[in-house]
């Protein structure tokens, strides 16, 4: 599987990064263990990349333990959730977990999960407005704008 091959790709510098930056987007299966997630994050970090864990609100290991989520951030990972989860479009539990991440200042990025714009219309504006209302404008600016711009700066795009 790709996850098993990840350390080899990273060591050979053949893994696709975000916009040519040092950031690597990691995605896991819903039931992957905390140990598995921790090992993958460690592998990415040990190869000099900066891991962003995508859809962190979908994984049982992170949702059931904000402490584990905090440990991942302490290791050097950044956490990303989907805007629809923040807005409560999927489950109440996902929305609650997203709120906990924001209150603990663990959330790094918000994504649209819009692989195409016909069937999954991005709702970033509504998400930014919601976060701004709940957490303040500066916080919303950081997770919706400043942190993503950090990736582009790292890639030399700006």
Residue locations for each model-derived region?
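Mid-to-C-terminal alpha-helical segments outside catalytic/metal-binding sites
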Residues: 124-158
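Extended substrate/RNA-proximal surfaces in nucleic-acid metabolism proteins
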Residues: 1-78
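A C-terminal functional module that forms or caps the active site or interfaces directly
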Residues: 80, 94-95
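Glycine-centered helix-coil hinge/cap
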Residues: 91-94, 136-137
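Active-site environment of divalent metal-dependent phosphoester hydrolases
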Residues: 58-62, 86-89, 115-119
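His/Asp/Glu-enriched short active-site or ligand-binding loop at hydrolase and phosphoryl-transfer sites
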Residues: 76-88
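Short acidic/histidine-rich active-site segments
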Residues: 106-122
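Active-site neighborhood of phospho(di)ester-bond hydrolases with catalytic His/Asp-centered motifs
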Residues: 52-54, 80-82, 109-112
């Amino acid at each position: 599987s790709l996850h098993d091959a990840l350390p080899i790709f990273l060591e050979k510098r053949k893994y696709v990064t975000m916009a040519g930056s040092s950031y690597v987007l990691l995605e896991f299966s819903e039931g992957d263990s905390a140990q598995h997630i921790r090992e993958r994050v460690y592998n990415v970090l040990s190869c000099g990349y900066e891991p962003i864990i995508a859809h962190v609100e979908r994984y049982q290991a992170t949702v059931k333990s904000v402490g584990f989520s905090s440990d991942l951030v302490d290791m050097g990972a950044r956490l990303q959730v989907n805007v629809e989860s923040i807005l409560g479009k999927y489950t109440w539990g996902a929305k609650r977990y997203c709120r906990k991440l924001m209150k603990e200042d663990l959330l790094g990025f918000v994504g649209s999960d819009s692989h195409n714009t016909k069937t999954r219309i991005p709702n970033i504006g509504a998400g930014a407005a919601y976060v701004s209302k709940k957490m303040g404008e500066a916080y919303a600016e950081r997770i919706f704008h400043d942190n993503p711009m950090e990736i582009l700066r790292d890639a030399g795009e700006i």
